[in-house]
Each structure stands twice: as C-alpha cells, then as structure tokens.
Amino acid sequence: MANSINWFEIPSKNFDRACKFYSSILGGEVHVAEMGGDMKMGMLPNFSQGGGVGGHISSSPDSKPSNEGVMVYLNGGDDLQVILDKVEPAGGKVVMPKTKSPGGYMAIFTDTEGNRMALHNA
C-alpha cells in the first residue's frame, strides 16, 4: 500500500465560491461533477507525480465545514508561499504563516467556507 490516505473531501456551504477559491490558490481547474440530487463534487487539481492522494470539494445537505477536527495538508509545491500569498486575495485567511517544521515548511489557513486547512512542502 503506497499511501495510508487516498482520498479526502472538503465540505462547502457555497460550492461555487469554494471551487473558485481552490482554483485560484492552486492554479488549476476544479472539475465539477453532478452526483444527482443535491450533491456535487469539485475535483481538485492533482499536482502529485504519478498519481497519489486526491480530493474534492463536496456540496450536499450534509456538508458541514469546520475549523476543528482533522486538518488536511495540501501539497505546497516547491515554495508554499506562492500558494499562501493567494489565500487572502481569494477570500480565505492565513492563520499560521510559512513556518519551518521537521519535515520542511508548513502553513495553516481557513478557506472561504471556514475549513481549517494546511499547506506542506519538503
């Protein structure tokens, strides 16, 4: 098994706003898929080499964004500051600036939906 985690969902209150936010900060298209009923998902751009962990923005009556609980670390690329600099102009908030960690660098932000998220790069 290559990865312990292979998929994640980011809940949204306003699906279109969340898709625009992640498209803006990650610099790639969010691909929207209708799931039927009140459910939609927006596939995040996958920047990993040769596949790997992926995720999507979810929209359903059960979607409940949160700044508590599990925190997802997105790939910050070669310099996560490039992505972090786009967070506030896109409507999010930087909670912890780029910080040296044992495995490289990390930063924490909240998205437009109120989800606490992080960036990491080695």
What are these regions (language model features)?
Residues A2, E9-G52:
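Core segments of cupin and vicinal oxygen chelate
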Residues N3, I5-K13, H31-M35, S60-A122:
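Vicinal oxygen chelate
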Residues M41, G54, M106-I108:
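Short hydrophobic/aromatic beta-strand element in the GNAT-like acyltransferase core
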Residues P45-Q49, P61-K64, K98:
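Short secondary-structure boundary/capping segments
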Residues G55-S58, A118-H120:
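Conserved beta-strand in the GNAT
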Residues I57-P61, D78, M96-K98, P102:
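Short, well-ordered turn and helix-capping elements at secondary-structure junctions
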